[in-house]
């Protein structure tokens, strides 16, 4: 099992409507891309010094499934229309989950 974690920092000009649209589109991802085994995302709670504004956690059975998700047309369209213009930076990590 592979876990993908992406932490996003917004641009200074991002609006609440853009964040809501981003989150709503993310919520639909597992319905369209059936390779996703677990999918969670949410805004930082600002409980301490934050390094990111939003996080996504997704699990996949294999590395190949992760790459298929990454290149899936729905995911690519999401990045182009709902993400790239509001994200100042993103940190990603993928790792194997212990059996």
Predicted regions and their residues:
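Short, well-ordered beta-strand segments in beta-rich or mixed alpha/beta enzyme
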Residues: 3-9, 41-70
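Generic, well-ordered alpha-helical segments
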Residues: 18-21, 48, 71-74
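Glycine-rich beta-strand-turn "strand-cap" elements at beta-sheet edges
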Residues: 40-50, 80-99
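Aromatic-enriched hydrophobic runs in primary sequence
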Residues: 4, 26, 43, 54, ...
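An amphipathic, aromatic/His-enriched active-site/gating alpha helix that lines ligand/cofactor pockets
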Residues: 31-36, 59-93
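N-terminal first-folded block
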Residues: 1-41
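Generic structural motif
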Residues: 11-13, 63, 98
């Amino acid at each position: 099992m592979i876990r993908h974690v992406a932490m996003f920092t917004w641009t200074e000009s991002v609006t609440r409507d853009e964040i809501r649209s981003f989150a709503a589109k993310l919520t639909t991802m597992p319905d369209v891309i059936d390779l996703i085994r677990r999918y969670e995302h949410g805004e930082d709670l600002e409980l301490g010094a934050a390094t990111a504004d939003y996080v996504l956690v997704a699990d996949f059975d294999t590395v190949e499934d992760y790459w298929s998700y990454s290149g899936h047309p729905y995911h690519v369209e999401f990045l182009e229309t709902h993400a790239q213009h509001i994200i100042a930076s993103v940190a990603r990590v993928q790792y194997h989950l212990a059996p």
